[in-house]
């Protein structure tokens, strides 16, 4: 049996200690040898990102997972800074910027509202696909394959068994993250 591809899980939550849902979701990833869990807020509490280190991590992995809560229709501030600084022209995009070409991007996102809030006419006025479009466009700019996001709606209000079910599905996906086995 072949080895699974190396997965870099970029975890960005400024209040991780208070996020039961994200702690439950991280558990299976932390048990897999081919998955590197990289907590951005733990590594960069001062927001001074080591760009070269981060780019080297990206080079070493085939699947990049961005796990974070949905903050104001986007991601937490440190992840936004990371995206702007690390995915620079000449590295991930623009002339000669093909370091991530052919790699896979998956967003794993927790929300504070129920699924029905993310639809045309719902509380947030737009479907979640529209809200996540900037991430999809960033993946395209980096010549990466966009994988369907995993969403845990109303995360803080989910029953423990529902969170465990999401964590199990996440762990199963992490064991074989490439669509069609990578073919």
Swiss-Prot record:
Annotated GO biological process: positive regulation of potassium ion transmembrane transport; potassium ion transport
Family: Belongs to the NAD(P)H dehydrogenase (quinone) family. KefG subfamily.
Native species: Serratia proteamaculans (strain 568)
InterPro entries according to UniProt: Flavodoxin_fold, Flavoprotein-like_sf, K_H_efflux_KefG, KefG/KefF
Function, in words: Regulatory subunit of a potassium efflux system that confers protection against electrophiles. Required for full activity of KefB.
GO terms under cellular component: plasma membrane
Protein name: Glutathione-regulated potassium-efflux system ancillary protein KefG
Assembly and oligomerization: Interacts with KefB.
Domain of life: Bacteria
Main localisation: membrane
């Amino acid at each position: 049996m072949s080895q699974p591809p190396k997965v870099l899980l970029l975890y960005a939550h400024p209040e991780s200690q208070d996020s039961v849902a994200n702690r439950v979701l991280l558990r299976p990833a932390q048990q897999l040898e081919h998955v590197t869990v990289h907590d951005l807020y733990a590594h960069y509490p001062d927001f001074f990102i080591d760009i070269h280190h981060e780019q080297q991590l990206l080079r070493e992995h085939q699947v990049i997972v961005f796990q974070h809560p949905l903050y104001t229709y986007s991601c937490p501030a440190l992840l936004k800074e990371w995206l702007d600084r690390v995915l620079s022209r000449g590295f991930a995009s623009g002339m000669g910027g093909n370091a991530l070409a052919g790699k896979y991007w998956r967003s794993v996102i927790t929300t504070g509202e129920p699924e029905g809030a993310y639809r045309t006419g719902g509380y947030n006025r737009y479907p979640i696909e529209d809200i996540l479009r900037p991430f999809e466009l960033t993946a395209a700019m980096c010549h990466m394959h966009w994988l369907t996001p995993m969403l845990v709606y109303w995360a803080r209000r989910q029953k423990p068994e529902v969170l465990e079910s999401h964590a199990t599905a996440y762990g199963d996906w992490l064991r074989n993250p490439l669509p069609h086995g990578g073919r």
